[in-house]
C-alpha cells in the first residue's frame, strides 16, 4: 500500500518495470520457436525421411509456442503506460506471428506432401 504521492509513483514505476521485464522472456521464447520452425523445414528437406512427421509436429508445437508467448507479451503490455514502447512491442509480436504462420505453412505443406505420397 502507498501512503503518499511519492510512494504511489514509486509503486507504479515498479509495476511498469516488472511488466517490461515480464515481456522479455516470452519474446525470447518466440525467437526460439521461430528457429525451431526453420530447423523443422531443414529436417524435412535434408534429414532422415523417417523424421518427416516429427519435424512437422515440431513446427506445429512451435507455432503454438509463438502464439502463446505472444499472448503473454500482449497481456503484459496492458500494464505499461508508455504508448511508444507498447506500439513497438505489438508491431514486433505481429511480425513474429506472421513470420511463424508463413514458415509453419511451408513446413506443413512439405510434411503433408512427403507423407501422403
Where are these regions (language model features)?
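Hydrophobic alpha-helical bundle architecture
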Residues: 43-51
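Preference for long, well-ordered alpha-helical segments
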Residues: 36, 51-111, 117
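Membrane-helix exit/interface motif
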Residues: 1, 38-41
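Long, amphipathic alpha-helical stalk/connector segments used for oligomerization, subunit docking
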Residues: 1-27
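Conserved helix-loop functional segments at active or binding sites
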Residues: 42, 113
Amino acid at each position: 500500500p502507498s501512503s503518499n504521492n511519492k510512494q504511489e509513483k514509486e509503486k507504479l514505476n515498479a509495476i511498469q518495470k516488472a511488466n517490461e521485464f515480464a515481456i522479455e522472456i516470452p519474446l525470447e521464447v518466440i525467437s526460439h520457436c521461430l528457429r525451431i520452425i526453420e530447423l523443422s523445414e531443414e529436417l524435412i528437406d535434408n534429414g532422415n525421411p523417417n523424421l518427416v512427421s516429427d519435424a512437422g509436429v515440431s513446427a506445429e508445437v512451435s507455432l503454438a509456442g509463438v502464439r502463446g508467448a505472444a499472448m503473454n507479451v500482449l497481456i503484459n503490455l496492458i500494464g505499461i503506460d508508455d504508448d511508444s514502447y507498447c506500439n513497438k512491442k505489438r508491431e514486433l509480436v505481429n511480425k513474429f506471428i506472421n513470420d511463424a504462420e508463413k514458415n509453419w505453412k511451408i513446413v506443413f505443406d512439405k510434411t503433408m506432401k512427403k507423407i501422403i505420397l
